[in-house]
């Protein structure tokens, strides 16, 4: 009984300390921070809308047809881009030091985060439209892109995988390598709440918790996975409870507040790089779109789908 109470007391003190650090980082946000975040989120929405336009209207192909690609939307989830402010970006370092840059694994709905970490709209559209110059060629030069499973390892942006939860496991492996090589690097692995139900995601979090790896998992609960609402996905009170089960600090934040994305990521990075281990950030948010471009009408209730 005394041992149990000691553990709970230690956890409470740790959680209070992390909460106070989040408040401190939030209080340090400047007007320049907010202007930069506004630019990032506006760019994300503009890219998102143009991708939708390309899907609906397409571009002419040599055989006389049209090609619009396949893609996923970020509507109402643009604020995740603000995590980049708290991270050491590869694009801000000399090329010789890029192995020290933080690693991020944006999900399909996190195009804004990929852009904020240094990817360009040109890279995004080249992948979406299957252009031969895309980085997303599967290792086969000139073979074209692959919708919005985009990334650029030179900028330490890991592309999403399908199934999506595998990216969490891959990022955990990269964090393990950094730990063993004593590279002072932070890793961020955002997923949706649907991903967090998968075995791969659970195994990744459990392994990170057991090894004390410098990684933060971010569960963005946008209230629906494909067509399954939250009540059909998990019985937990909040998705942050999953972190406590794995022995890592976890907290919940409002996904409509850019400052909280920054403050939470900054604290997770501090905790990880000081030897504290992994964290879980639970984001309560909502998506203003369907699962993908082809799914918007169905999501909004139209019989056509």
Which stretches of residues belong to each language-model region?
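Active-site cavity-forming subdomains of large catalytic enzyme subunits
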Residues: 207, 217-223, 267
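Short, proline-centered helix/strand-breaking motifs
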Residues: 214-215, 249
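Glycine/aspartate-rich loop-and-adjacent alpha/beta segment that forms the canonical ThDP
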Residues: 1-13, 271-305
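Cofactor-binding active-site loop characterized by glycine-rich and histidine/acidic residues
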Residues: 53, 62-211, 229-247
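Structural motif
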Residues: 105, 186-191, 216-218, 280-284
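Conserved phosphate-handling catalytic cores of large alpha/beta enzymes
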Residues: 228-235, 245-280, 285-289
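Cofactor-/ligand-binding subdomain signature composed of acidic, glycine-rich
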Residues: 1-70, 100-101
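Short beta-alpha connecting loops at secondary-structure transitions
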Residues: 223-228, 248-253, 299-305
């Amino acid at each position: 009984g005394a041992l149990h109470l000691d553990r709970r007391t230690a956890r409470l003190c740790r959680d209070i300390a992390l909460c106070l650090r989040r408040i401190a980082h939030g209080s340090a946000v400047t007007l320049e921070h907010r202007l930069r975040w506004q630019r990032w989120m506006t760019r994300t929405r503009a890219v998102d809308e143009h991708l939708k336009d390309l899907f609906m209207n397409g571009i002419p192909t040599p055989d006389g047809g049209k090609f619009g690609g396949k893609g996923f939307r970020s509507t109402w989830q643009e604020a995740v881009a603000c995590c980049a402010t708290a991270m050491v970006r590869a694009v801000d370092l000399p090329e010789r030091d890029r192995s020290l840059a933080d690693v991020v694994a944006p999900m399909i709905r996190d195009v804004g985060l990929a852009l904020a970490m240094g990817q360009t709209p040109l890279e995004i559209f080249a992948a979406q439209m299957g252009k031969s110059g895309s980085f997303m060629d599967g290792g086969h030069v000139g073979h074209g892109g692959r919708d919005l499973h985009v990334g650029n390892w030179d900028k330490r942006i890991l592309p999403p995988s399908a199934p999506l939860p595998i990216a969490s496991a891959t990022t955990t492996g990269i964090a393990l390598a950094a730990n063993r090589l004593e590279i002072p690097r932070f890793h961020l692995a955002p997923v949706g709440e649907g991903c967090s139900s998968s075995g791969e995601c659970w195994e990744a979090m459990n392994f990170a918790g057991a090894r004390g790896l410098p990684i933060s998992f971010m569960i963005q609960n946008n209230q629906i996975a494909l067509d399954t609402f939250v009540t059909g996905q998990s019985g937990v009170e909040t998705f942050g409870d999953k972190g406590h089960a794995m022995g890592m600090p976890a907290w919940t934040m409002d996904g409509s507040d850019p400052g909280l994305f920054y403050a939470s990521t900054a604290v997770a990075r501090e905790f990880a790089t000081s030897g504290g281990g992994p964290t879980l950030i639970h984001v309560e948010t909502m998506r203003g779109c369907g699962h993908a471009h082809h799914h918007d009408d169905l999501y909004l209730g139209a019989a056509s789908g």
